[in-house]
Amino acid sequence: MSAWNALTYEGKDTILRVVREEAERMFAMAEAPGAWEAPTAAGDWQVRDVIGHIVDTTEGYFHSFEVARAGSSREVHGLPAMHELAGAGGRSFRGVPQSEMMSRVRTDLDKILDLLGGISEEEWGSFMAPHAYMGPVPPSIYAGGQLMDYGVHSWDIREGIGRAHAISADAADLLVPYMFIVWQYTIRASADLSPFTIGLTVTGRNAGSYRISISEQGMSYEPGDVSDLPTVLDFDAGGLVLTAFGRINGGNARGNLELADRFLNLFYRI
């Protein structure tokens, strides 16, 4: 298995290293003069709300693991509720001074990296902790969640600054395997799920081609040849990540463009 696929244990050290790197870059931006109340590309969030969101989310992760270790459960809200609840959670810290929030987010980062760093190979993909929005998921998903927060929201902060910029290749490459899971969890309740299959190719350290099938059961995917399919979407790693998160409309489509449009509009954006 690849050290760049953090859904496997072989990728654990890589993703935890990149989470730390992305976090430190975010912290530097958040502490820049005048940045705290600056706008971002995450809806109406300001930079301080991004930091608040990460504190709220990370401390929720601690609770999830405590609950799981105790053999208990917690309320699961479902991903459709995440936009509203996560936004409220992030904004709830607006009255807390910047210095206090930055100290708290750094402490939380150290704690979550220690927690995830101590997860065994056996538990990385099998120990189930109840995520507030996704339900029971393994530690590999929590690591991905940290990289999504620090990687994608760093992109949001840079986008808010208004200068040309790019998502880091390390973050994007690591997030590629998670994007198929994001799509599985974000299909609109009103979506037309009459069956079809399309192809998707992606470049980077997790380069490959995938067959994605839609049916009444939702979305499934598997690696495979896509040359026989009516539509193929081509992405680089950053384009796939930012498209799956609704930040851009990226990639290019080959073949039946109407089918490509139908697929890309199946999902609500988080």
Residues covered by each model-derived region:
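Short, helix-capping/interhelical loops that line the mouth of catalytic, cofactor-
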Residues: M1-D13, Y61-G118, E122
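Non-cleavable N-terminal signal-anchor transmembrane helices
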Residues: M1-T40
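Short, contiguous alpha-helical
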Residues: S2, W36-P80, A129-R188
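Acidic interhelical loop/turn segments
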Residues: F27-T40, D110-Y142
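Acidic/His-leaning functional-site neighborhoods
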Residues: V202-V232
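C-terminal interaction segments
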Residues: G224-I270
